[in-house]
């Protein structure tokens, strides 16, 4: 593949470079030969990796950071009217664009495979990427998460395909140019952007119809809202699902060994013995989306099946942080919507039937907690024990949401029938409580999009230390 070009642009400055989507685009630009600088309020592993790749990153926002940039890129999380770097760039006449516009430009000379949906985007995008790489297709890839298989969030390939996670937040995906558009799931989310479900549905329909006449839309018919969009499509489409009749379906699903084995039925053909090494029925559904993409681009079914078998998961997507000989498991997952929490708890319950499930959930955003407290409580109630942490505010402020705390979720879980439910605002107290819970055949399931991941890492480290001490004593 020739180097990506953006006219005479060579120096790109990224405001908020440490965010999942922004760090991925920074990584892609660096690997494509651009000089990248950036700024972020936080530091950490992602920032360290970008520096290793050659990025110049400043902690905090300062006007002088924009320097000799040819363009300044920012995300939906940044307020352009008050950010000093954006204001400085505008004063200097430097173009200022949003992340999705930059991504759309990078896609211009590629055949885009864009995976959208309120759930499963990251996993499905990574499955498609793994499948294409295993088939020797050499795609360019950009995912809003970290894959050990990809050794990061991006791949710059020589092939014609570009596999992209298409984010619906702030209507970002409407800047993309898909040749294949995957509608993986759809339900109420990001109402701060859309206001109504009708608006969200309209936006997904607009995204799907951006596919050219020679492209295809891949639709999950297990989601009622996607079934409502299908009659509005003016492009060819393939359907997939488990619960509903579809062009591509899964049957004979057998969970076990941390994953699932199942049969794919596609356009009248049967493909038994498909193996997926990540747990959960929701991941079987994600695999069907990838299978449908593979068929559309002409991959032999055996190559598709081999690629799916090689998929090993994403960081923070049912990621095993600790596995003890006594059956103790520590899992870290990004689930932060009731549907995701329900699917993740079910995956734990189905995959480890003999284990006691201890769910540790950190609500993300006051607005989301206020809207979905009841649904979160019900989703968590299938666990044997539930711990709810304090809300991770992200871009929101507590004073704007009086009375909204994690206790709402805890109380909803009790109402849904959970017997052992605790709300603990402070992480130190929560860590101490979890240490008391540690016992053989216990699965600790940490869920949330905030800093609960750090608590999962600390608890996993404590489990490792306890095991080492026990081994030393025994010897």
Swiss-Prot record:
The keyword Ribonucleoprotein does not apply. GO terms for biological process: cell division; cell wall organization; peptidoglycan biosynthetic process; regulation of cell shape. It holds the Pfam family Mur_ligase. ATP binds at residues 117-123. The keyword Cytoplasm applies. Keywords: ATP-binding, Cell cycle, Cell division, Cell shape, Cell wall biogenesis/degradation, Cytoplasm, Ligase, Nucleotide-binding, Peptidoglycan synthesis. It catalyses: UDP-N-acetyl-alpha-D-muramate + L-alanine + ATP = UDP-N-acetyl-alpha-D-muramoyl-L-alanine + ADP + phosphate + H(+). InterPro entries: Mur-like_cat_sf, Mur_ligase_C, Mur_ligase_C_dom_sf, Mur_ligase_cen, Mur_ligase_N, MurCDEF_pg_biosynth, UDP-N-AcMur_Ala_ligase_MurC. One of its GO terms (molecular function) is UDP-N-acetylmuramate-L-alanine ligase activity. Its EC number is 6.3.2.8. GO terms for cellular component: cytoplasm. Belongs to the MurCDEF family. Cell wall formation. This is UDP-N-acetylmuramate--L-alanine ligase. It comes from Chlorobaculum tepidum (strain ATCC 49652 / DSM 12025 / NBRC 103806 / TLS). The lineage of its organism: Bacteria, Pseudomonadati, Chlorobiota, Chlorobiia, Chlorobiales.
